[in-house]
Regions:
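Conserved N-terminal segment of class I S-adenosyl-L-methionine
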Residues: 1-89, 95-99, 112, 151, ...
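Short, glycine-/aromatic-enriched active-site segment of Class I SAM-dependent methyltransferases
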Residues: 125-147, 151-156
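Short aromatic-enriched loop/helix-cap "lid" or pocket-rim segments at secondary-structure transitions
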Residues: 137-141, 177-183
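Conserved S-adenosyl-L-methionine
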Residues: 163-174
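Feature marks short, surface-exposed loop/turn motifs that line or immediately flank catalytic pockets
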Residues: 133-135, 172-175
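A short His-aromatic
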Residues: 100-104
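A short glycine-rich, Lys/Arg-flanked "PGG" loop and its adjoining helix->strand segment in the class I
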Residues: 109-124
Length: 234
């Protein structure tokens, strides 16, 4: 499978699946209301998770190709828009998700301020971003990232954008980080974001099971791939 970030697809595999499961767990722990904005939804894998868990999801992406897939694939409203200029009224949503989005946006504070605008006071925001600016490299440039985040940079951006941070957790140690370094990046170099070939699929299923062990180590900073953050609108 692939999905789009702008004009570049991303390979969806075990790392992606683990991150989405962890992000959903964190999001649900904030007791969000029913009306949820998924901003930067790609082709909708997280929107589908939200819908399956009973949320009324509005999915937004800047990519016309992604929006075309979203309209075929996910329930609820779909809109094409940049996260810094959302086409919704003030306080239109109970909760919002920015899953692997802010690292693509030059004006991340502006994006957070815009999401805060469309959330009701006290509304829940869940965020995931890649960690450790020192690890910025070819796979980030290929994916269209403009940055990776330190913990403090992420906290500061969210606070400046109008949010109170409730929790911020590192994720990805140990197995997802090893997968990223020794399998994901090498596969990207060789095959780009092509769909997994038939012989790869059983191996990916096994890897998905192995990576679930990382749930036991959420919060460990060493070697973390990213951060998961839960906040409420001021």
């Amino acid at each position: 499978m692939t999905h789009e970030w702008g004009s570049a697809p991303e390979f969806v595999g075990p790392r992606h699946e683990l991150r989405e499961k962890l992000l959903l767990d964190l999001f649900r722990s904030g007791s969000p209301g029913p009306h949820v904005l998924n901003a930067g939804a790609g082709t909708g894998s997280f929107s589908l998770r939200l819908a399956e868990n009973g949320f009324d999801v509005t999915s937004v992406d800047a990519s016309s190709a992604a929006v075309e897939v979203l309209r075929r694939r996910v329930p609820g409203e779909v809109a094409q828009a940049d996260v810094t200029t959302l086409p919704f009224a003030d306080a239109a949503f109970d909760a919002a998700v920015l899953g692997e989005v802010l690292e693509h946006v030059e004006d991340d504070r502006g994006a957070l301020e815009e999401v805060a605008r469309v959330l009701r006071p006290g509304g829940v925001l869940a965020v995931s971003v890649p960690a450790d600016p020192k690890r910025f490299g070819p796979s980030d440039r290929w994916a269209g990232h403009v940055r990776r985040y330190s913990r403090q940079e992420l906290l500061s951006a969210c606070q400046a954008g109008g949010f109170t941070v409730e929790r911020c957790r590192a994720w990805g140690f140990p197995f997802a980080a090893l997968y990223h370094r020794y399998l994901y990046e090498r596969r990207l170099d060789r095959h780009g974001a092509s769909a997994p070939r038939r012989w790869e699929r059983p191996a990916l299923a096994v890897l998905s099971a192995i990576l679930q062990v990382d749930r036991l180590f959420v919060g460990v900073e060493r070697g973390a791939l990213g951060y998961l953050l839960l906040a409420t609108r001021d």
